[in-house]
């Protein structure tokens, strides 16, 4: 479709793969217009923020996402998705769908192996949010979920192995390679 957008970003994470300190934030406004080739006229706002703080071998993670559609009708390509590690970990990737999506998370990670070649971590997250047709339902009908995971920093990037859980379904197992922070992993599509 045809759209205009403006995007502002702030990235001070010390490591895109397994950050130990810093913050990442992104704000984006998108205006899709039929006159530019879009299927419908609609506007969307996306905001995300993640931060890390480390004390010795202990790391605290916090973050949130708020993506909203300002119009009632949107084409299927404008729908937001949630699910997957650190994006409503108790749900399969992209299994939560809606014109609006939001979540908050808090996490803890402990460095169990301090080898410079293959550092290893064990961590957990607690997450709350949802995808919904109406903006007001994102958090009022939110779902509690989280994860327990192992992470290893390899020369090819991090490997995450874990289990996600949610209040309304059984466990979701995951194996993930690569970045979970930064612009490539925080987008809506």
Put a short name on every predicted segment.
Residues 1-120, 124, 132, 175-182, ...:
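C-terminal outer-membrane beta-barrel translocator/porin domains of Gram-negative envelope proteins
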Residues 135-189:
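C-terminal beta-signal and terminal closure region of outer-membrane beta-barrel proteins
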Residues 127:
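Acidic/histidine-rich, metal-coordinating catalytic segments
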